[in-house]
C-alpha cells in the first residue's frame, strides 16, 4: 500500500501500481506517490479499477477489521530510517508510526475477483512493454 513509501531515489526501473477504486485501501495515496515519483523522473503507471475492491472484486464491502490505510489523505514519506514526513510536510516520528498512526479499524471483504483477469493482463502488458532485450 502507499500510505507509507520511500522518497524517490534514482532508479531506471519502471513501476506499476494497480488499485481498486472501492478498496479499503483507497487509490489517493498511490496517486500522490506516483506524482512525486514522476517529478523525480520515474516512469510510473497507476491503473485504477473503478468497480473493484482490494481483491479486484465487485462484491466487496467495508467491514470492521484492522488495516494500514489511515494516512490515505496525507501519506508518510520515508527519507531515511530516522526522518519521516507526511506529503504535506509534517514531521512524523517512528514511534508514532509504530503506535498506529496509519492504522484504522476498517477492513475489506468480498473475493469474487471479477477484475482479476484484467489486473493480470495489465501486469503482463506492463512487463512486455518494459522487457529488456
Model-based region annotation:
Residues 43-133:
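C-terminal catalytic histidine-bearing segment of alpha/beta-hydrolase fold enzymes
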Amino acid at each position: 500500500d502507499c500510505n507509507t513509501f520511500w522518497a524517490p531515489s534514482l532508479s531506471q526501473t519502471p513501476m506499476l501500481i494497480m488499485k481498486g477504486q472501492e478498496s479499503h485501501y483507497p487509490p489517493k495515496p498511490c496517486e500522490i506517490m506516483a506524482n512525486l515519483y514522476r517529478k523525480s523522473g520515474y516512469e510510473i503507471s497507476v491503473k485504477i479499477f473503478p468497480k473493484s475492491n482490494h481483491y479486484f472484486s465487485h462484491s466487496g464491502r467495508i467491514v470492521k477489521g484492522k488495516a494500514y490505510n489511515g494516512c490515505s489523505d496525507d501519506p508518510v514519506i520515508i527519507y531515511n530510517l530516522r526522518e519521516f514526513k507526511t506529503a504535506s510536510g509534517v514531521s512524523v516520528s517512528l514511534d508514532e508510526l509504530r503506535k498506529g498512526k496509519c492504522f484504522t479499524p476498517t477492513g475489506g471483504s468480498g473475493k469474487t475477483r471479477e477484475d482479476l483477469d484484467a489486473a493480470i493482463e495489465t501486469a503482463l502488458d506492463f512487463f512486455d512493454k518494459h522487457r529488456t532485450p
